[in-house]
Amino acid sequence: MFQGFTPEAVEFLWGIKFNNNREWFLPRKEQFLALVDRPMRELGSELFDAIAAEYPKQSLKLHVCRIYRDARRLFGRGPYKDHLWFTIERPHERFEGVPALYFELAPNYFSYGCGYWDASPATMAKLRRRIETNPKPLEKIVRKLNKSRFTLTGQPFKRPKGDVGKLLNPWYNAKNIAVGYDDNPEGVLFTPELKDEVLAGFRELMPLYLYLDSLAGDPEANKE
């Protein structure tokens, strides 16, 4: 049962950030498993069970990231990730192809939200066409989100794609879509109540998740 992370877990992630090498990590691997990996998996499993029970038709799965970076993509960085996360999403072949609910823990923050890791141009074209042809469903979602703790984090195009009004312009002109809430690694992070907070957030975000996930069923939009 998830009991919260600990200050030692945050300190461990700082340790990886400044000592990202096998010589530092390997003698401390058991610490990593106890302090970071185990509570991350407990939190993810309990949140997944709750969301999957409420949305049984969605065929969701839980994915907890591994600490090891892809050796083909180190680009001069160390072999270990200094921030870890899990996602709740439907099964897929390409990780950028579907939206997800996520929780992330880093040395200097924790975060949770919903969106794409890296939405494809085709997916974003489908979203823009939805906004053009039937904006009301997304307008309803965005109005509620604008009153919540979550903020849109998608990077905008340097040259806007168009003007669809103040409410949806940030969504229409984004290269990628994600909304999230960031907090300092303290307080509720170190308590069992973190699960309740994140679960409430996930429930609040499910209308957005379902909307984004439904884009996969739209026909390809015309090239712009």
Task: Label each residue range with its predicted role.
Residues 29-36, 116, 126-131, 190-194:
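Short histidine-centered catalytic/ligand-binding loop motif
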Residues 14-67:
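Active-site acidic/histidine clusters and adjacent loop/turn architecture
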Residues 53-80, 84, 149-162:
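A short, surface-exposed loop/turn module that caps and links secondary-structure elements
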Residues 106-164:
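Compact, glycine/acidic-enriched structural inserts
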Residues 1-15, 44, 131-132, 136, ...:
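Long, solvent-exposed, polar/charged low-complexity segments
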Residues 62, 81, 109, 174-176:
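Sequence-level motif detector for i,i+2 pairs with an aromatic at +2
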Residues 72-132:
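Aromatic- and glycine-enriched beta-alpha-beta binding-site module
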Residues 47, 51, 55, 142, ...:
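Long, hydrophobic, amphipathic alpha-helical segments used as structural scaffolds
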